[in-house]
Amino acid sequence: MKMTKKKRTKVFLTLLVILIVLLAGIILTNSFGGRQETIQETMRDAVLHETGKISFLGIKDVNPAFLSAVTVTVVLLIAAALIRIFAVPKFTYIPGKFQMLLEQVVGLFDGLAKSNSPHRNGFLGAYVFAAGVYIFCGTLFELFGFQAVTTAGESIALPAPLSDINGAIALGCLSYCIILSGGIAGNGVRGIGKTLKDFSLPISMSFRLFGALLSGLLVTELVYYYIHLSFVLPVVVGVLFTLLHALIQTYVLTMLTALFYGEVSEPVRKKENAERQKKAA
């Protein structure tokens, strides 16, 4: 009984401390004076990036997402080089935890490429792996809350690279170029025609990425503005949206790229023979 009372007392005191901290946070995070951006201004800037520019190496003022893209790219390249130099030579027939994890990730994207493009998948597997890792890590990047100083002297949290429409369009167009190269490699000039037939593909890919990431940002901003508990619920909402978008958008873009690549790179003769066999059956 004594232990039970002690436990109850500890639980009660813990809850009381948490409640006091939350109340203090609510009071301290409320604005007293000074101008704050309205929700309309915040959401407009999230889409158009008219304000909040960052000086990039003193050369040019850029959107925060560009700096995020450069940071994520450099980190991934350094990580890839370190893994190749120090980890890969130590791989064994009986894999350790890190080797097993790496093999599972590589095998996932390699299997995706082979299942959707069985006739031509060497380069496709490498591309969907690189694109998938970039989308996943880039989406999770905003969770770290790295700060940068704008040209106006204000502090701003770096967003996900693909939350900028320019980054999303660049990745969508790059994926379309990869699909086009597969069509040329598989069917020559005829492959170009098959690929250009889906001219809206890069637009749909780009806006799918941008729209998904932007929706998470806007929902989080709405929660910040209209729910006063601005340091508890937005964290949960932001993490959930970010994790879901990282997984979903990685899968969607890599799947679409592999699917269309396999379609345009499939040799025409094999496709015609397969259709004849189906009709004969």
Each language-model region and where it sits:
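Selective transmembrane helix interface/packing segments
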Residues: K2-A281
